[in-house]
Amino acid sequence: MISTAVIMSALELGCIYALVALALFLSFRILNIADMTTDGAFTLGCAVSATIAVAGHPLLALPAAMAAGACAGFITAFLQTKLKIPSILAGIITNTGLYTVNLAVMGFSSNVSMVKADTMFSLVKPFLGSFYKLIPAAVLTVVIGILLTLFLKTRLGLSIRATGDNPDMVRASSINTAFTVTVGLCLSNAMTALSGAVLAQYQKTADINLGTGMVIIGLASLIIGETLMPKGKTWMKALGAILGSILYRFIIAIALRLDLPSECLKLISAVIVALAIGLPAIKSAVRPATKGGKA
């Protein structure tokens, strides 16, 4: 039996990690770029958020983390568009460099504690009672999801979508694809860093390894969401990413309740992503065999 506390925790974490799913929805699905900056950008958001919160500015930490994440996305885009480095390799290079940057932000310490510091959650606790973590996380995620959906309907947003669909056609239309890719990656990593910033204040700690495997977690949430919302408008796909993240956290909660070792969670995530991405190939391989068996 899953307790109320476990359900609340799954909802809270699902809303927080949904920002990563939305970020990957923009980079992986809209721009069609496998951005490997995600892990480092998430930790960067954690580091910036914790450092500024400890200094006494927990709310200022959120836009600051987003700005830092956007800078990380800009570097990846610069490597990709100006230096012509393949997108995956560009993300890996940026992610590797961010390890040192994140350590520097945290004062060359592997973790930062916020036990004695105010957070965005502790500030609203007197007003929201037992929902002081869920409501801010849910509202923030919904607002970001709405803003992303509205942005993708603007002229620039449509240009970004077109760049992911057919970059050659976009270039023929005199649209600067380097600019659209840069904007897309900056926004994507800003959302990832915001997720890390909120998680750091949620846990009241930031650790250099918090972002490890985040791209897999985000992809798992995104793909689960696409299963829930396979077709539809942009807002439905964004909603699917959010719901997928929440459902993923419930899957993890159930796995922990079944006494599965916590070390196995990353493996479970990897298997979910591999099966979901490879599902079309599996279906096409099974159908001919089934028809042959009937014949």
Question: What is each of the regions a protein language model found here?
Answer:
Residues 165-172, 176-179, 232, 236, ...:
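Cytosolic-side transmembrane-helix boundaries in multi-pass membrane proteins
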Residues 13, 88-89, 115, 133-138, ...:
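Loop-to-transmembrane alpha-helix initiation sites
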Residues 4-57, 78-83, 223-231:
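Single transmembrane alpha-helix segments in multi-pass membrane proteins
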